[in-house]
């Protein structure tokens, strides 16, 4: 509260690792769900979106609550948020498997990226997504936090330049 009063234009973000919108909305600043308590977090992380899109990527949208219907059903609860436009959406981060897991499914990434970037959320891109970095936590945290390829003379490849990227990247 004091931080918001002293610096009203400063944004605070909370990693609310719950996978249902009602639980996430509870933590956003001025939520009626948590009244009279107030977390004062202006931005909460949408782990529900993360969970739904990572489940949907392996499903067909054939029946209710599968595939993109699963993602859509996440957004119908936006009315629970005091400020849905100040919710942070992501498809992967440093604590999760990479969106591509251990694969390199470009069409899947091409479907998820526009949704992430155009939804009524603050999009968060984890470094390496743009060059299709993959990895799973079951191997280790370090496997999903590998160094970005490039930037140092000792790097075998340099994805910071077009010449250092593969055709698919």
Give the ranges of each region predicted by the language model.
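Surface-exposed cleft-lining segments at the edges of enzyme active sites
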Residues: 97-101
